[in-house]
Amino acid sequence: MCHIWHSNRKEVRKFMMKRTISGMIGAGSLAHNRRDFVAENVDPDRVQLNICYKNENLKEVYKELFDDAVERYNIGKRKDRQIVNYYEKIRQGKQEKLFHEVIFQIGNREDMAVGTTEGNMAVKVLDEYVKDFQKRNPTLRVFGCYLHQDEATPHLHIDFVPYVTNWKGKGMDTRVSLKQALKSLGFQGGNKHDTELNQWINHEKEVLAEIAKQHGIEWEQKG
């Protein structure tokens, strides 16, 4: 029995397929992610294969995260210094974005095409990966999460609001901040080529690679 088990393990290693893993910042087109419209590169016959894990209203998420902090901040402030609508304040400001998006994909249209055995394997890996994303990243409040299978290659869109609590600096004690949200997760950043965001994306790719490995896919790192 032990001999058979060792043999099987060698067979799995022998047939490990090598695939690239990509993680990138997306444009954050919520209408595209939700398929409010069908772009040219989308196959309308496969739209029903898409998986929607989360699809919340961004304004409601802002109320959930920041309304109490706005109330605390406004205490004792002159009316012209008070924050009336934090969502609009961020939307109209230049320091922070309302939300950020990250996209993850295994392989490409040549080796992990939608509808193929390999493509279905990519779907399984991405599905397993996303299940613990929020738990792993508590300061990145996910409000939109979609696994698309109606384009060339299965890929995952994750839309989130990065925030920090117990902030001691200027402004509200709970506020939008990508830099501080990632710092609280342990990513300190180094220079402009080694930012908190780059460190975090690389870490998430490693998490994805570990799950892929359990499914017989080895991360092919290029460059």
What are these regions (language model features)?
Residues M1-G223:
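N-terminal nicking endonuclease/strand-transfer module with a His-rich metal-binding environment
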